[in-house]
Amino acid sequence: GFAAKARAVPVTLGEIPSAMKNYPLIFMSQERPSLLAVTGVYDDINLFVDDNGNWEDFAYIPAYVRRYPFGVAAEENGERMAVVIDRGYEGLTQGGQTPLFENDQMTAQTQAAVDFVKNYERDRQVTDQFAKLLMQHELIQQQSAHYTPAGASEPIAFAQYFGVDEDRLKGLSDETKLELERQGAMALAYALLMSMGNWRLILQRRAKRFGLNEQDVFKPIATN
């Protein structure tokens, strides 16, 4: 299934309240601070998708995945964009039961999909502005995720990522905090910090998926 081998999936600002319940929410880099939901570690396997390509019940499915097979092709300046479709999608067939067009017009289902993609693209642009705002205040920094397996005396760093620096966030001047609060950025920044508790759940999910014990939770798995 789509995104079955993805370790991370893009998410937008409006998805944070739902996505933070399942995934660590991080940024791709400081140069490209796109917001991502972590779905796996070490292996090219999405731990929320089963071997049949189905997402786990009750796990939040990011809009990036739900919009598929539709997507956006945009100019670099972002002034113009076109909604596109993946012609390699297995569900796209000649003479299928659900047509994309009727009488040279988009069907209601196609129009709904196009509207969803357009809304997603607008949300993505707002998310980019949020990330740039955090970058202006140097709040996106390289971080390490740690886990202490049973029997270990010290935590082990198992992932490097870019995320909100809590110390820098707390150290902002009152004036800057107030400015960020007015823009709704403070609450979202703390929501990203709260999502970091899901790193432990990601490792536990990996251990369960591959039958690993606490000591072997970092062990690489051979996959095709």
PLM regions: where:
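Short linear motifs in intrinsically disordered
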Residues: 13-18, 61-63, 134-139
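A contiguous, surface-oriented mixed alpha/beta subdomain in the mid-to-C-terminal portion of proteins
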Residues: 72-224
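Short, basic/low-complexity N-terminal boundary segments at the transition from targeting/disordered tails
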Residues: 1-5, 44-49, 53-54, 123-129
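Aromatic- and glycine-enriched beta-alpha-beta binding-site module
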Residues: 26-28, 34-100
